[in-house]
A protein has these predicted regions:
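Active-site and NAD+-binding cores of ADP-ribose-processing enzymes
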Residues: 65-67
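Glyoxalase I/VOC metalloenzyme domain signal
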Residues: 1-62, 72-228
Length: 228
């Protein structure tokens, strides 16, 4: 889709990609506990076309389907991936002219990667450290946390720490939950952004319980840009 390139990599006697060089340095204050890519999300004009592409070319399966609506925008999303669950690729399609997906397609001049989700072992410390380094995240209203204990149940993290870091929480299984937060777009146009995500137990979802709060946060940014 768009200018996206898929690379096949076989590692043999290498720590990473050919030509990779480990540069010294990094974050001097705080700790950023990023581990690996959790999933990559695509925004496209025709979702089913690319779901079929991944099924026929890569042998992936469709593993989830979402139809999300707010008062002002909407999207449809299907998730494809391998049988083992190592690869997860949600694919979004706009279902309204003023949706965040349509805005992305307009600004990006076509289909492309909407966001990259990075897995962390400690999202509170990671988000705090990234903010100290200048990262900007979407804002979460304090009211989001009023019903959090009753909605997600007991979690290992301290709720006050989660609230101070403005992290979202969702329980997608009885024995699994996730914490997540999204950056603002990293370029001057509303295109690519990052997600920081932490999973506990057998969590395999994408924060479906947070979609309403996430959409409202994105729509606030769209209002600032005059997109809606």
């Amino acid at each position: 889709y768009g200018d996206t390139v898929h690379s096949f990599v076989k590692r043999s006697g290498r720590d990473f990609m050919p030509g990779f060089r480990n540069e010294a340095g990094g974050v001097e204050s705080g700790e950023i506990h990023l581990m690996m890519i959790d999933h990559i999300v695509a925004n496209v004009e025709c979702m089913d076309e690319w779901v079929g592409f991944y099924e026929s070319v890569f042998g992936f399966d469709e593993t989830a389907h979402f139809d999300i609506q707010t008062g002002r925008s909407a999207l449809m999303s299907k998730v494809v991936g391998d049988v083992e669950g190592y690869i997860r690729l949600p694919i979004n399609e706009p279902s309204s002219d003023n949706s965040q997906i349509q805005e992305f397609l307009n600004e990006f001049k076509g289909a492309g990667v909407q966001h990259i989700a990075l897995l962390t072992s400690n999202i509170v410390d990671t988000v705090v450290a990234m903010r100290e380094q200048g990262a900007e995240f979407l804002s979460v209203p304090d009211t989001y946390y009023d019903a959090l204990p009753s909605r997600v149940g007991e979690i290992k993290e301290n709720l006050e720490d989660v609230k101070r870091a403005a992290v979202l929480v969702d329980r997608d299984r009885d024995d699994g939950y996730l914490l997540q937060l999204f950056t603002k777009p990293i370029f001057d146009r509303p295109t690519l952004f990052y997600e920081i995500i932490q999973r506990h137990g057998n969590s395999v979802g994408f924060g479906e319980g947070n979609f309403q709060a996430l959409f409202e946060a994105i729509e606030r940014e769209q209002e600032k840009r005059g997109s809606i």
